[in-house]
Amino acid sequence: MDLIPDLAVETWLLLAVTLV
């Protein structure tokens, strides 16, 4: 589970910003 940590974090951040 260490293939795309940065990508996952960025995706979650974008999702959070979109939701908020």
Swiss-Prot record:
Source species, domain of life: Eukaryota
This protein's UniProt keywords: Endoplasmic reticulum, Heme, Iron, Membrane, Metal-binding, Microsome, Monooxygenase, Oxidoreductase
Biological processes annotated in GO: estrogen metabolic process
Induction statement: By phenobarbital.
EC number: 1.14.14.1
GO terms for cellular component: endoplasmic reticulum membrane
EC class of the enzyme, as a word: oxidoreductase
Compartments, as annotated in UniProt: Endoplasmic reticulum membrane; Microsome membrane
A GO MF label: metal ion binding
Main subcellular location: endoplasmic reticulum
Family stated for the protein in its record: Belongs to the cytochrome P450 family.
Known role: 6-beta-testosterone hydroxylase.
Record-given protein name: Cytochrome P450 3A5
